[in-house]
Amino acid sequence: MRICIVLEGCYPYVTGGVSSWTHSLIRSFPQHEFVLWCIGADSADRGKYVYELPDNVVEVHEVFLNDALKGVPGHKRARFTPEQKQALSDFVHCTSPDWGVLFETMRQKGMTPIGFLMSETFLDLMTDICRQDYPYTAFSDMFHTLRSMLLPVLFLMCQQVPKADVYHTIAAGYSGVLACLGGYVNNAPVMLSEHGIYSREREEEIIRATWVLPAFKRLWVRFFFMLSRAVYGQASVVTSLFGNARKAQIELGCDPSKCRITPNGVNVEKFGAVPPKEPDGWVDIGAIVRIAPIEDVKTLLYAFAEVKHYVDNARLHVIGPEDDKEYAQECYELARQLDLHDVLFTGRVDTAQYLSKIDFTVLTSISEGQPLSVLESFAAGRPCVLTDVGCCRELLDGGEGDDLGCAGFCVEPMNRMALASALERMCADDGERRAMGEIGRKRACTYYRQEQMVTTYTDLYQEVVSSWQA
């Protein structure tokens, strides 16, 4: 089987939970060929992989969104059928366009993204939306907003499509559109595996964003919901990591019959071989993160400063690469300002090896799905302090039918005092830590084994391709 994995802003360029999952998935199916179709922001990243690609990756197709501005204008006076005009109108209004018609329209000879955005048809559509919904908004603001919003998607529609038996996208945004394009052009099935709810995550970002004019925030939110609906509609199977995520997909319009829960899987043999930490007089706390705003490392540093007032022998290890260099520099400066001498920023390391130095782990993310780093900690017998986002509380307390017990503490996000209190409590009692760590180990071994995930995806790939061919 030839499987095209469609990726957006992750593997193989950066590390992290989704990238680790993707790498593990590919390595788990040596009998299949994999094609990577990767969307990135900047063409300067072309070929700069942080992973050594497995031997069964036979092709890599890279698409960089900043290349969208390098295209030639094309025909400004392109003629459109009534059907095409309706699809383009629905697209510009961010409702429910006919994606097949859009794909055919943008791939016709002489059509380019810039050409459409400079056409009379686009001007007419933009004038309509201004009159209907934005009568008091500057026309120039609307033009630049729609241009920046629509250009990347129009650019993606014009890409050459690699051949595959199935197009498997790991997000419901730009990569979802690209997977739909692949399925449409080559008459092949589409699968979606969401690690977080893409449209909800973008909505949260837009609400907080300062770069989006207030008048256009609702339009931007509609835009990302439109992208999600596209792949929800075309995909044969839509997976999520836990029950509440599945409910969210259904609320957003996905057919419940398509929705499957496929939890992450961890190599319990590899991480189970991590020995208990040797007593050395320190209580070592590990934060396995990418240093980026979504991980909220700053709240962790503030909380650790509080911990040091009461637990002098506490030591914090921030384990992972700089995903956002500017934010990382701010974190280093904050650690200096707080006079935190017992904080180590390790950079990228072998997580399994490094966990032998750690008593317990902490994750302070403001948005998560089902963090793989937590499952790795559990498999290594390390309890966790987590923020109450995504599936984190369920991981700590157990889901339906799981009565193993509690594997750590859960606190609300961005609450430094609650986080500090939980860290202090975990530092205080070695016996409680070990008991919670053992519960975590049993939970990982029972419910989150990599072999279970591989079996699930073996069945899903076979089901999707067989059903499509039938």
List the predicted regions and their residue ranges.
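A short, well-ordered alpha-helix in the C-terminal region of glycosyltransferases
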Residues: 183, 407, 418, 425, ...
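Carbohydrate-associated surface elements
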Residues: 244, 265
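Conserved donor-binding/catalytic core segment of Leloir-type glycosyltransferases
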Residues: 277-306, 317
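Glycosyltransferase donor-sugar binding loop
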Residues: 315-329
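Nucleotide-activated donor-binding/catalytic signature segment of Leloir-type glycosyltransferases, i.e.
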Residues: 328-348
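Aromatic "clamp/platform" in nucleotide-sugar-dependent glycosyltransferases that forms part
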Residues: 366
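Short hydrophobic beta-strand element within catalytic cores of glycosyltransferases
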Residues: 383-386, 390-397
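Conserved acidic donor-binding segment of nucleotide-sugar-dependent glycosyltransferases
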Residues: 398-416, 425-430
